[in-house]
Structures are given as C-alpha cells and as structure tokens.
Amino acid sequence: MDARERRRAIMGVLEGAKDPVSGSALAREVGVSRQIVVQDIALLRADGHDIVATNRGYVLQEA
C-alpha cells in the first residue's frame, strides 16, 4: 500500500466510524506506526478534509 492508498484507507475508516477512532487503531488498520498516521492526518487536513482530533480519537466532521 502506497501513501496515497493509505490515506484513502484512513479516510474510509473515518467515514465509516460512528465514534472517534484512535491513532493507534488507524495505525493497526493500515499497518503503519501511529506517527505515520499523525502525519497522514495532517496531510489530509491540508487537502481540505475536516478531521478533528479529540481526546478519544479522530473524527471526520460532516459537511
């Protein structure tokens, strides 16, 4: 899985989640470290995705 596919997978998890998703859970899902997930979330935000970090995990805000 390349970086673009990984970010697409992260978005898929967030879009399907009813509750916040932790960075560790996202890391396990896509097979990378939590730090890579943090970097990917930053890139996704820079691309205009409204992802919010809460104390329970990441949430994709509805448009």
What are these regions (language model features)?
Residues 1-29:
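Extreme N-terminal segment that seeds HTH/winged-HTH DNA-binding domains in transcriptional regulators
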